[in-house]
Amino acid sequence: MFKTILCPIDLKPRSKMALKKAINIAHQFNSKVILLNIHEEFMSKEQMTMSRVSVSKLGDEFKKIALEAKGDMKFLIKELEADDIECEYILRDGKAYDIIVKIAQEKHADLIVMGTNGKDSLTDLFVGTTAQKVVESSICPVLVMPKGN
């Protein structure tokens, strides 16, 4: 039923809970798990230029963050492979909900398993959370790990 499971992960406790759930489902259905790590842009190139922020310095910072994330993900991938679960790792930058939905479509994901970011701000009430936007935009089922799980 679920051949490919997409699991966006940021290495925070909720996304680790989502990964555990994705692993359980992968065992049941002999699924492939795609780990997706996204670093959101907090400022566009135009905003950086106007703020006199160096695009190259931020690019260097992103590379540093990406290398650290890749190292952390290699550990998770080894765990998955030890459990005989086929896996793939993808690193992207951009708006999380856009990237999640796009990768799910590109990789023909049958299921997205994700955690919530845990924010309870007024902005989330009006703008919505990443998980909410993914649920609204995705063409495949989305399993969201709620707070407290």
Where are these regions (language model features)?
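General small-molecule cofactor/ligand-binding pocket signal
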Residues: L36, E88-R92, L143
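Generic structural signal for helix capping and beta-alpha/helix-loop junctions
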Residues: M43, Y97-I99, S121
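A short acidic, glycine-rich active-site loop
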Residues: V55-A69
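Short beta->alpha linker loops
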Residues: E68, L91-K95, N117
